[in-house]
From Swiss-Prot:
This is Serine/threonine-protein kinase PDK1. It comes from Cryptococcus neoformans var. grubii serotype A (strain H99 / ATCC 208821 / CBS 10515 / FGSC 9487) (Filobasidiella neoformans var. grubii). GO terms for biological process: intracellular signal transduction; positive regulation of cell integrity MAPK cascade; regulation of sphingolipid biosynthetic process. Its EC number is 2.7.11.1. Residues 850-859 have a biased composition (Acidic residues). It is an enzyme of class 2 (transferase).
Length: 1230
C-alpha cells in the first residue's frame, strides 16, 4: 500500500527557487480557504522530478480532541536549517489561567503574543511512494466536496492558527519530526522498523478501526507530547488500532470494548423504556397521606410524552414511601409484599416477567462483524429474502404456516394512529405506520443513538384463536386438536415486551434463520384500520437464554435461537430487571367485552417502581374519586342498589385476586378506591399473603404469625393465631357489605379489645328495615368456622345478586349513590368529613351524633407504643396488636378467669384500665337488688356497665374496658355504710362521718382524695363483690335503681343530676359548666384559633375515679346547664327531669336521655410506696389513649387538658372558678 513519509529533506530538494507564476507560501502566510472543509491548506511545486510539498503547519495542540491522530500533533523538535530559511512562526503568549490566546472551545485569536516564544519548524511532507498521498490530492477533491478527511471539524472557526506554548523536554532538539502517514487503517505505525518501508500489508476485512477502506481512519486520542515516540502513550480511545505506540491489544479485548459501547445505547435503540426517575414525572396535588407513604397525582414530563399525541398526558398516582421510616418501624416487608402482589396481579404467570433495558445483542445499535453475522431490522423493506415484503398494503411471506397460532386484532383509535406490522419467522413486532398508496412504511427505525424512542399510541388488542392450517386466523374458530383454554391462552398471549426493531441472526449467518423460515411461515397480514397479525409458535430450546432476542411463546417462556455458548464473548452481565409489565402489554377490557387474564379493572395497577437515596416510588393507576369510605361517611350509608353494585364488583375482584394466589388480608372501605367512572379498585396490598395457585394451605400452629389487617374486619381465625386463608377475605367482605348497608362495621367496639371479643362471640345486630336477602347473605358469610363460609361462586349465585349480570358488570355505568338506612348527620359537611376526623371523636358534629343508633367512637384506635420507645415483637403490626387479640381470645374461652392481680393494673400487659384502690378490696354480701336479679336470671353477672343505653346510647373507652374485663370480679367486696349530710363547700366536698365498719366498707380516703356519702336519707348502698359476674342489662337495671334512690333523697343536690352517668361507687368531686373546644395534639401548634371548631357548652365533672367527664345536656344546650358559676353545683333549686331516677322514665336512658358523655380524660394512678407496686414496660400514660398527660392554664379564664389523642380547651366564667378547678385537679393527681 502506498505511504508517505515526513523526513529531513536535502538542501536541493527542500529549498527550490521560487517561481514567479506560483509564489512560495511559507507557514505564517498560510490561510484557510473558506470553501474547504479541511483545517489545513497545502500548495505544491515541482521544480525537480520528485514530488515535494510546501511546509505545512499542523494544528495547535490546544484544539486537539479525542478525534485527533498522533500523527497530526506538532513536535517540539526544531529543524536544523531554521537559520537558513526564515520559515518560523510563533504562537501567542499564555494568558492568565494557561489559555494561550486560544480559548478551549472559542474562536482563535489573531493577535500575536507579546512575550518571546520558542521557535518551531513545521515538518515537511515528502511523498516517497509513486502513489500520491491523500493529503496531496485534497486540492482536487475539494471541487466535488463529497469526501473529507476523517477527523476534520466543520465547526472549526476560520482564520489563522497558532501553536501554543509547549512543554520543552530536555531531550528536545531542532531535528524535525519524522512522521509516517498510512492509508491502511490497520497499519501499526511502528517508526522503528517500518518507517522506511514503501510496502504495507493489505488491511483485513474485519479491521476493528472504524472508517472506510482506502481513506484515513478516525484519529485517536492525543498523547503526551513530551514522551518519546517509542514510549507508552496514554491512549483514551480504542479506535487507534490493535498496537499503538508499542502497546499490544488483543482482538478479544477490542471486541469487549466495542460490545461495551454498544450496550450503552441498546435500550434506546431497541425501543425498551429506560428506567424511570423522579425527573420523568410532574408532581400534582397530594391525594393522601398514609402511615409511611404519601400519594401524589402525577403526569409524565414533556420528554416522555409525545407532543404529537392527540390525547392529553395520562395521569398516574405516585406513591412515595419513606425508606427511613420503613427501616425504623420495621415495615420494609410491607412495601416489598405490596410490590410483589401487584406484579403478580398484573402478570401472574410463574415465568419471569419482561426484562426491561436488557443489553442484548438484538438491541445493540451497531452492526456485528465476523462470526456474529449481520443485523437486519424488521422495519426494513429492502430486498432481503428473509424479510417480509410490502406490496399493495399487504405484508406477506413466501411460506405458509401449517401450525396452530394466535392472532392479534389491533384496532387503531384514529386514521393516523400507528398500527402493528409483522415480519417473517419468529421476530418481534415493530410498530410502524402506513402512509400513502406506495406501500412505504414510515415509523420507528433502528436507533443508533441514546435518544428515547418515539412513543407509540396504545392499541386495543383482542386475541383470537386461529385455524389449524393457517386459514381464517381471524374468525375465532377453535382447532379440533387443541381445546381453547381461556386462562392459559390469554395468559400467554398478553405477555409482551416493548417491540425491538432489530433482529439478530445466528452465529452461522443467515442459513440458520433461513431454516427457521422454512420450518415455519406466516399468513399474509392486511394493513388497514384493523389488521390481523400472525405469530407462529417458536421452538423452545432446551436451555432458555437470558439474553438475545426474546420471543413470544405460547407457554409463557421466552426463547431465543442462540445460547450463551454460541456467543461467549458477546454475553453481557445480568442486570437487575423490573418484573412490572409494560404499558402496551395489558390493554383495557372495557372496549372488547372480554376480560384479560393479565389485569383486572378492579385492582390498582403497578406501572413501574424506582427509588432514590431517600424514598421508594410506585407508579400506580389513578383513582380520582378517592376512597369508598368517604362516600359512605358522606351519605351515612349506601342505598341498596349502590350497595349491591359495589358489592358485586368487590366479590368479582376478590375472585380474580384469589385465582392469582393472593390473599389481601386487609379488606376494608378505606382500601377500596373509586376511579373516574366510579368503579372500584382495590389497593394497599402491603398486608397481602402471596401463595402459589395449587399450594396447599398448611396449618402450622407452632409458627409465629403476624397480625395484619384492621380490628373491625379481622376474622376470628386470625385472632386465634390460625392460618389466614381466602375465607378470611370472605369474612371481611361480609363486614364491608354490612357497612355498605348499615353505615358502620358490624363488630365495632369502644376499643380493639372489645371489638375482638364481639368478633369471637359473633355479636352482630341487624337494624330494622334491612333487606332480607342482604341479611341472609351477611349472616351466612359471618360464620365463625372458616370451612363453613360460602365460596365466591355461591355468593355470586345468591338471591341478593340475582339482578347483577357479572359479564357486563364492568361496562355498565355506575348507579347514582344515595343514602340508605342511616342518614348522614345534618351538621356534617363533606369538607369536614374529608379532613380525616381532625377535630376529634367527641365533636358535636360527629357523624351519627344525631342518629339514634349513632356510635360515638367511630375512629379507629391505634395501639400505642410502650414507654421508652422500645419496639418489641408485634408492636409494629398495623392497627391492632398481638396482646389485645390474645387477651380477648383467652377471656372468651375462659369467661370465669380473672386477670386482676392487685389494685394497680399493668396497662401494657393486661390491657386493664386504671381503677381506684377500693375497687378490688374487701368482701361482703351483695345487696338485695343484686340477689333478686341473679335469682331471676339464674346465673351470675359477668360485667359492669356504666349505663351506655341509659345515658343516651353513649359509650366511653373506660366503661367498655370495665365491662369487658369484669370490673370488680374478684372476691366479693360489698360496701355498706351510712352517709352523713353534705356540707356546702366552695371547692371540694368534705367527707362525712362514715359508720360502716364491716370488711366491705369503703375506706375513708385514697391517695389524699376524700370519700363522700350520698346525702341524708340515702341509707346503705352495697357494692357488687369483685368475684361477682353480672350482665350488662342487669347492671343497667341496678344503675337505674340506684339513680332512683338518689332522686328520692330529701335534699337533692346538683351532683345527683350527673350520677346516672357515673360508675358504681364513683362520686363527684367538682363540677361546673364550661365552654369546650377540642383539637388534635398534632394540630394544636399549627392551627390558628379561627380554624378550630366552634366552642360547645358542656358540663365538666371531676370524679374520684379519678377522671374528667365532658357531658352534654341536649335539653339545656341553649342555656346554662348548671345555672351557677360557683363550681360546686350545690344549688338547692337543681333541675331534675321528670321521671325521676330512670326507673320507668321516658325517652332514652330512663329520663336521662338528654345527657351524653362527649369526652373523657382519665388520671392514671401512679404506683405508691405503700403497696410496693411498680409500673413495668408498656405502662404509663402512653398505654392509655385518653390518659391525662398535662393540665396547663391558658389565658385568664381557661385551661387545657392534654391526652395522647385529644387536647381539650376549657373556658370558665370567672378567674376564681378557674383557680378552683386547678386546685381540684392538682389534688387529684397533677
Amino acid at each position: 500500500m502506498a505511504s508517505s513519509h515526513f523526513g529531513p529533506a536535502s538542501p536541493a530538494s527542500s529549498t527550490p527557487p521560487p517561481s514567479s507564476a506560483y509564489a512560495r507560501l511559507i507557514a505564517p502566510t498560510i490561510t484557510r480557504n473558506s470553501s474547504s472543509s479541511s483545517s489545513r491548506s497545502t500548495t505544491t511545486c515541482s521544480s525537480t522530478s520528485s514530488v515535494q510539498a510546501v511546509p505545512m503547519r499542523p494544528p495547535p495542540i490546544e484544539t486537539s480532541t479525542a478525534a485527533t491522530s498522533r500523527s497530526q500533533l506538532p513536535s517540539n523538535r526544531h529543524s536544523e536549517n531554521e537559520a537558513e530559511h526564515d520559515t518560523s512562526y510563533t504562537s501567542p503568549g499564555l494568558s492568565v489561567g494557561g489559555r494561550g490566546g486560544l480559548a478551549r472551545n472559542g474562536p482563535r485569536s489573531n493577535r500575536l503574543g507579546t512575550s518571546p516564544q520558542a521557535r518551531h519548524v513545521p515538518p515537511s511532507i515528502v511523498a516517497l511512494s509513486p502513489s500520491p498521498s491523500p493529503i496531496l490530492n485534497m486540492a482536487s477533491k475539494r471541487q466535488s466536496n463529497t469526501e473529507t478527511v476523517s477527523g476534520t471539524s466543520p465547526s472549526t472557526p476560520l482564520g489563522k492558527s497558532f501553536l501554543a506554548q509547549q512543554d520543552l523536554s530536555p531531550n528536545s532538539s531542532t531535528i524535525p519530526l519524522r512522521v509516517t502517514i498510512s492509508v491502511d487503517p490497520n497499519d501499526r505505525l511502528s517508526h522503528d522498523r517500518e518507517s522506511h518501508s514503501a510496502e504495507r500489508p493489505r488491511s483485513s476485512g474485519n479491521s476493528p478501526v472504524r472508517g472506510r477502506h482506502g481513506h484515513l481512519s478516525t484519529p485517536s486520542s492525543p498523547t503526551n507530547s513530551y514522551r518519546a515516540l517509542g514510549g507508552k502513550p496514554r491512549t483514551l480511545s480504542v479506535d487507534a488500532g490493535q498496537n499503538w505506540g508499542g502497546s499490544h491489544r488483543s482482538r478479544a479485548r477490542d471486541g469487549d470494548d466495542r460490545e461495551r459501547r454498544q450496550s450503552q445505547v441498546s435500550s434506546a435503540s431497541s425501543g425498551a423504556l429506560k428506567k424511570h426517575s423522579l425527573d420523568d414525572w410532574v408532581l400534582g396535588e397530594e391525594l393522601g397521606v398514609g402511615s409511611y407513604s404519601t400519594v401524589y397525582c402525577v403526569t409524565p414530563s414533556a420528554n416522555t410524552h409525545s407532543p404529537t399525541s392527540p390525547q392529553p398526558a395520562r395521569k398516574y398516582a405516585l406513591k412515595v414511601i419513606n425508606q427511613a421510616h420503613l427501616i425504623q418501624e420495621k415495615k420494609v416487608k410491607y412495601a416489598m409484599v405490596e410490590r410483589d402482589a401487584l406484579i403478580r396481579l398484573s402478570d401472574p404467570r410463574p415465568s419471569k416477567g419482561h426484562k426491561r433495558g436488557v443489553s442484548s445483542s438484538s438491541s445493540s445499535g451497531y452492526a456485528q462483524t465476523g462470526s456474529a453475522g449481520k443485523r437486519r431490522s424488521t422495519a426494513s423493506i429492502g430486498g432481503q429474502s428473509s424479510m417480509a415484503s410490502v406490496s399493495g398494503g399487504t405484508v406477506s411471506n413466501s411460506k405458509k404456516d401449517t401450525r396452530d397460532r394466535l392472532s392479534i386484532v389491533t384496532t387503531s383509535s384514529a386514521a393516523s394512529s400507528p398500527v402493528l406490522t409483522a415480519s417473517s419467522g419468529s421476530t418481534q413486532l415493530s410498530p410502524t405506520a402506513v402512509s400513502g398508496g406506495g406501500g412505504n412504511i414510515k415509523g420507528r427505525r433502528p436507533s443508533r443513538s441514546a435518544e428515547p424512542p418515539t412513543p407509540v399510541q396504545e392499541q386495543t388488542e383482542m386475541l383470537i384463536r386461529g385455524g389449524e392450517d393457517g386459514k381464517d386466523g381471524q374468525d375465532g374458530q377453535e382447532t379440533p386438536s387443541r381445546e381453547w383454554d381461556r386462562d392459559r391462552d390469554w395468559d400467554n398471549m398478553t405477555r409482551s415486551r416493548p417491540p425491538s426493531p432489530v433482529r439478530e441472526e445466528s452465529a452461522e449467518g443467515g442459513e440458520k434463520e433461513k431454516d427457521e423460515e422454512e420450518r415455519s411461515g406466516a399468513e399474509p397480514v392486511e394493513l388497514g384500520a384493523a389488521i390481523h397479525l400472525t405469530l407462529p409458535p417458536p421452538q423452545i430450546p432446551s436451555t432458555p437464554e437470558p439474553r438475545g432476542s426474546p420471543l413470544l411463546s405460547t407457554d409463557g417462556h421466552r426463547t431465543s435461537r442462540e445460547t450463551p455458548r454460541d456467543r461467549p464473548h458477546l454475553t453481557p452481565k445480568r442486570r437487575r430487571q423490573s418484573l412490572a409489565p409494560s404499558e402496551r402489554s395489558v390493554k383495557s377490557a372495557s372496549t372488547t367485552g372480554k376480560m384479560s387474564a393479565a389485569a383486572h379493572p378492579g385492582v390498582v395497577r403497578l406501572y413501574s417502581t424506582f427509588n432514590d437515596s431517600s424514598s421508594l416510588y410506585f407508579v400506580l393507576s389513578l383513582a380520582s374519586n378517592g376512597e369508598l369510605a368517604s362516600i359512605i361517611r358522606k351519605h351515612g350509608s349506601l342505598d341498596i342498589t349502590s350497595a349491591r353494585y359495589y358489592a358485586a364488583q368487590l366479590i368479582d375482584t376478590l375472585e380474580f385476586v384469589h385465582s392469582r394466589g393472593v390473599i389481601h388480608r386487609d379488606l376494608k372501605p378505606e382500601n377500596i378506591l373509586l376511579d373516574e367512572d366510579m368503579r372500584i379498585k382495590i389497593t394497599d396490598f402491603g398486608s397481602a399473603k402471596i401463595i402459589a395457585k395449587d399450594e396447599p394451605i398448611v396449618d402450622d400452629s407452632s409458627r409465629s404469625r403476624s397480625f395484619v389487617g384492621s380490628a373491625d374486619f379481622v376474622s376470628p381465625e386470625v385472632l386465634r393465631n390460625e392460618v389466614a386463608t381466602t375465607a378470611s377475605d370472605i369474612w371481611a367482605f361480609g363486614c364491608v357489605l354490612y357497612q355498605f348497608i348499615c353505615g358502620k362495621p358490624p363488630f365495632r367496639g369502644a376499643t380493639d379489645y372489645l371489638t375482638f371479643q364481639k368478633i369471637l362471640k359473633r355479636e352482630v345486630e341487624f337494624p330494622k328495615g334491612i333487606d332480607e336477602d342482604a341479611k341472609s347473605l351477611i349472616d351466612t358469610i359471618l360464620d365463625l368456622e372458616p370451612n363453613l363460609r360460602p365460596s365466591i361462586t355461591f355468593i355470586k349465585t345468591h338471591p341478593f345478586f340475582q339482578s347483577i349480570d357479572f359479564s357486563t358488570l364492568w361496562t355498565i355505568p355506575a348507579p347514582p349513590i344515595s343514602s340508605g338506612l342511616r342518614e348522614p348527620s345534618k351538621s356534617t359537611t363533606l369538607a369536614q368529613l374529608e379532613a380525616s376526623d381532625i377535630w376529634g371523636v367527641f365533636e358535636g358534629s360527629d357523624v351519627g351524633e344525631e342518629d339514634e343508633d349513632g356510635f360515638e367512637y367511630d375512629a379507629d384506635t391505634v395501639s400505642p407504643r410502650p414507654e421508652g420507645g422500645a419496639v418489641g415483637e408485634g408492636m409494629m403490626e398495623p392497627l391492632f396488636d398481638r396482646r389485645a387479640a390474645a387477651s380477648a381470645v383467652h377471656n372468651v374461652d375462659h369467661p370465669k378467669f380473672s386477670r386482676l392481680r392487685n389494685q394497680y393494673i399493668n396497662l401494657g400487659e393486661d390491657l386493664d384500665p386504671p381503677r381506684p384502690a377500693y375497687a378490688g378490696a374487701g368482701t361482703g354480701g351483695r345487696g338485695k337488688r343484686e340477689k333478686e336479679v341473679e335469682k331471676k336470671k339464674g346465673e351470675k353477672a359477668r360485667g359492669l356497665s356504666h349505663g351506655s343505653e341509659s345515658s343516651g346510647g353513649n359509650r366511653s373507652a373506660l366503661a367498655g374496658w370495665l365491662e369487658a374485663i369484669k370490673f370488680g370480679g374478684a372476691g366479693g367486696g360489698g360496701m355498706s355504710g351510712s352517709a352523713t349530710s353534705v356540707a356546702a363547700s366552695d371547692t371540694v366536698r368534705t367527707p362525712g362521718t362514715g359508720t360502716g365498719t364491716g370488711p366491705g366498707s369503703r375506706p375513708g380516703s385514697r391517695a389524699g382524695i376524700p370519700s363522700f356519702g350520698l346525702g341524708p336519707g340515702s341509707g346503705s348502698r352495697s357494692n357488687r363483690g369483685s368475684g361477682a359476674s353480672m350482665r350488662s342489662d342487669e347492671a343497667r337495671d341496678l344503675s337505674m335503681s340506684l339513680g332512683g334512690l338518689r332522686m328520692n333523697m330529701s335534699k337533692a343536690s346538683e351532683f345527683d343530676k350527673w350520677t346516672p352517668l357515673l360508675l358504681a361507687n364513683e362520686s363527684i368531686i367538682f363540677t361546673s359548666p364550661i365552654t369546650l373546644r377540642t383539637s388534635s395534639p398534632a394540630l394544636q401548634l399549627h392551627l390558628p384559633a379561627f380554624l378550630l371548631p366552634a366552642p360547645k357548652k358542656r358540663q365538666l365533672v371531676l370524679t374520684d375515679f379519678p377522671r374528667l367527664l365532658m357531658i352534654k345536656d341536649d335539653n339545656e344546650a341553649d342555656g346554662d346547664p348548671a345555672g351557677s358559676d360557683s363550681g360546686a353545683g350545690l344549688s338547692s333549686s337543681s333541675h331534675v327531669e321528670s321521671g325521676g331516677g330512670g326507673v320507668g322514665g321516658g325517652g332514652r336512658g330512663g329520663g336521662h336521655g338528654s345527657l351524653r358523655i362527649k369526652g373523657e380524660a382519665v388520671f392514671v394512678p401512679r404506683p405508691s410506696t405503700a403497696t410496693g407496686s411498680s409500673t413495668t414496660k408498656g405502662g404509663g400514660y402512653s398505654a392509655v389513649p385518653n390518659a391525662v398527660m398535662d393540665v396547663q392554664e391558658k389565658g385568664s379564664k381557661g385551661f387545657t387538658v392534654q391526652t395522647p389523642g385529644m387536647v381539650y380547651y376549657c373556658h370558665v366564667d370567672s378567674v376564681e372558678l378557674r383557680a378552683k378547678w386547678m386546685a381540684a385537679i392538682h389534688r387529684v393527681g397533677l
